[in-house]
């Protein structure tokens, strides 16, 4: 990348190719975009456009085949497995479309469980209240 920006997230010519030498599937083809800190962004597109792949790359759950993925000035595209684990644990939050909760724990207990691996855990009750779940703290 040649120019400096104040982007919090920056993808520069990111590609993701799955498959073998004989069969290649290009899931993401040299995409570039920037997101400023605090900016609200929606990723939309038709099925198969690469939305999930891009989110998985940003979330550190998949790695780009090529390009740069900068988050807060750090190129996570160059992270090894251990660094990506730390990034997922300490720097990023992900809400999956099909999430898995521990069924015999309440909403509050599920969040408290996840916070046990955080360096600087937030208050579970406060977090749930902030996302509109104040009345469901004790729901299973």
Which residue stretches match the model-derived regions?
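Short coil-to-helix segment of the ABC ATPase nucleotide-binding domain corresponding to the Q-loop/switch region
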Residues: 103-112
């Amino acid at each position: 990348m040649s120019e400096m920006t104040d982007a919090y997230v920056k993808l520069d010519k990111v590609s993701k190719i799955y498959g073998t030498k004989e069969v290649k599937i290009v899931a993401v083809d040299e995409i570039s975009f920037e997101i400023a800190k605090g900016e609200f962004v929606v990723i939309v597109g038709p099925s198969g456009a690469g939305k999930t792949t891009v989110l998985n790359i940003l979330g550190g759950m998949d790695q780009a085949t090529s390009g740069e993925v900068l988050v807060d000035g750090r190129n996570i595209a160059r992270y090894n497995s251990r660094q990506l684990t730390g990034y997922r644990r300490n720097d990023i939050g992900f809400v999956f479309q099909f999430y898995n909760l521990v069924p015999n724990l309440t909403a509050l207990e599920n969040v408290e469980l996840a916070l046990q691996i955080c360096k600087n855990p937030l208050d579970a009750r406060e977090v749930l209240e902030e996302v509109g779940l104040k009345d469901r703290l004790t729901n299973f």
